[in-house]
């Protein structure tokens, strides 16, 4: 081949090092950004599903009634984002015979969660971390918890359990801080729903394995337990 042509072709070809070398820091930064974006999208989706599910139940309740009585305006609690939407839905719902809306206690020291006693309790009794049913019927139960994990050197399992009479009926489980992740802080939302027929004196409680990770500072109003009587024999 002509030496001049060979030299021109060599000048057009990109250097092998330039084409293949990508700084390790750039890759780690890109992965960290992708992980955070995925987490925020997942949290927003869960919150939207929570509101949508409760709203759907409310529509079904409204369709079963002839009129909706005026709701009280003196409810002392005010939530933020998802919990605020949930509380607003409950305040405007036609059922008033039996319902409750409680926020998690500020200081937790055991796996069975305790709740603020100054929440809304109507036709339901609260005792030692339990909601105690006073009227039999079909109840809708919802619990939402926000976790903040300072990642240790190992993965962490976050679990939320809904218990009826001390027996686990529903649970949600997620593993965070897995090996290879670049982030040091993880925000994780867990929620669970249950529709079940409950008798008088039935107890409802919530357990978590890692109560120390429940975020009562950044999102104190996002940790709620709520129930309402959807249908009874009356």
Swiss-Prot record:
Residues that carry a glycan: 81, 109, 153, 189, 201
Keywords assigned by UniProt, alphabetized: Cytokine, Disulfide bond, Glycoprotein, Membrane, Signal-anchor, Transmembrane, Transmembrane helix
Coiled coil found in the keyword field: no
Membrane side Cytoplasmic: residue ranges: 1-37
GO molecular function, one term: signaling receptor binding
Disulfide-linked positions: 151-177
Keyword Transmembrane helix recorded: yes
Organism domain of life: Eukaryota
Family designation: Belongs to the tumor necrosis factor family.
Its biological purpose: Cytokine that binds to TNFRSF8/CD30. Induces proliferation of T-cells.
Protein known as: Tumor necrosis factor ligand superfamily member 8
Lineage of origin: Eukaryota, Metazoa, Chordata, Craniata, Vertebrata
Gene name of the encoded protein: TNFSF8
